[in-house]
Every structure is written in C-alpha cells, then in structure tokens.
Amino acid sequence: MKNVGIDIGSTTVKVVVMEGEKILYRIYQRHLSQVRQATLKALEGAKQFLNDTFQVAISGSAGLGLAEDAGVDFVQEVFATYKTVMEYEPDTDAVIELGGEDAKIIFLSGGLEERMNGSCAGGTGAFIDQMATLLNVTTEELDELSLKHERIYPIASRCGVFAKTDIQPLLNEGAAPADVAASSIFQAVVDQTVTGLSQGRRIEGKVLFLGGPLFFFKGLQQRFQETLKLGEGKAVFPSWAQYSVAIGAAIYTRGLEKSYTYEEFTGKLE
C-alpha cells in the first residue's frame, strides 16, 4: 500500500508518495496562504501513483486546521521529523531545521529535546525573503552573492525591522552587496538559531540540516558549517531536506488502519 505525507508549513506545501522506503513522487511549492487549493493542486501530480487505496497523514504548522476539517490523521511535525531521521540517518546527534516562519533544534543524543522559535520570523525563511527584498534581489541572487563575500558585518536577525536598521546604513556607506547580503544576512540567521535556540548546549557530533532554506541556500549551509566548526562528514545536508516532515508523515501512516481512494481523500479536502 502507498503512503502519503503532506506537510503544510507557513509558506509552502510539500507532498510525498512512498512505497516502502522508496519515494515515488514529491512536490514542494508555495501556497500563498491558499492552503486548501494549493494542497489539492499538489496532489494532482500524485494521482498517477494512487490508483489503489492509500494511507495518508497531514503535518506542519498550517496543516492542523485542514486535517481537522477533513477528519484526516494529523502528526506533529517534530515527531514526523524524528521518524524521518530514524529511517534515513539514525546515528544523528542533532537536527537543525529552518522553515518559512519557524526554526528548531532537536537534540537526539543524550535524550530527545526540542528547542523551537515559533513566535518571531527572525532567523527563518521569511527573514531571508525580507532581506532579499530590501536588497532588491531575488533569494536566488542573494545566495549567489553570499558565496562571493569577503567580510562579514554583524547585523540583527531578531526581526526584519532591526535588521533593516543595520543593513541600510551599510549600503549607504558603500558596503559590497555580497558582504551585506550574503554573509552578513546568512550569518545573522546562523547566530539567531545557534545562540537563541541552543541556549548554551553544544551542537556537536553528526548534525542534520533540514528545511527549505537549508536545502536551497548554499551560502547559508556554508555559514552554519564554518560557525559550528563541524568535522568532516559531521554536517549532513540530505537531498530530501525540504521534504523531511512530509516523509515522516508518510512513514507515520504505516501504522494507521484507515485508507482512502484518491477521490475519497481529495473530496474530504474540497
């Protein structure tokens, strides 16, 4: 039987279809606050793999309401992430995950412990979007600039307002966009995550980096690696990083009894 996981975050929807450990289909797209419509659209591409009944669960910060309305199983995203990590990288010591509007660290060695920032978009994908807009570049261009930096300027990342008051004077004084954009903005995200969430606990051993921002932005990956001084092979950026919660939701469904046809399930979402 196929297993479907749906992760609806603050800015994106992710859908995966699995058969055993094999991922048959996956999609990642922004929902622009049109959660129900975007989820149904994302499922259209999965239809070809769902000719028989399948099991499904929804996860994510914006998924609970839809799951409750549809009467579909919901799995908390930290638990879904844990499921994925145990399936693919079971020797992981810590997980750093950045989403559109939240950031979290999950410590796995020495007892499971989660630290999360969900009250402010500082140090998240939304912050990066805001800073790209301030610099009048796309997020892709911001990332490209970051890889060309020569120095790092300290800026705040607690929120876009404070960061803007740091960045604008730098630009006015002629600071290179590569230095401001990249390194400084991405370094601010790293500092916010490490300092704000670790709260003095060391991030060491094998660290798994998950979530869209940590998959798409190579400059952000670089800043985390250099800041944490992780040894060779200890910083892992998996190819499925942006789908980790959706994969975990799909894995979770293996223990469910309820199954649906494609028409039954999409009918519940409409």
Located regions from the model:
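Short beta-strand-loop/turn "lid" adjacent to the catalytic site in phosphate-handling enzymes
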Residues: 19, 28-31, 46-79, 106-115
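Glycine-rich phosphate-binding loops at beta-strand->alpha-helix junctions
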Residues: 62, 199-227, 238-242
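Short glycine-rich, Thr/Ser-proximal phosphate-binding strand/loop in the N-terminal lobe
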Residues: 3-37, 41, 113-114, 118
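Glycine-rich phosphate-binding/hydrolytic loop that grips phosphoryl groups
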Residues: 128-129, 237-270
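Glycine-rich phosphate-binding loop plus the immediately following alpha-helix
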Residues: 110-151, 159, 251-255
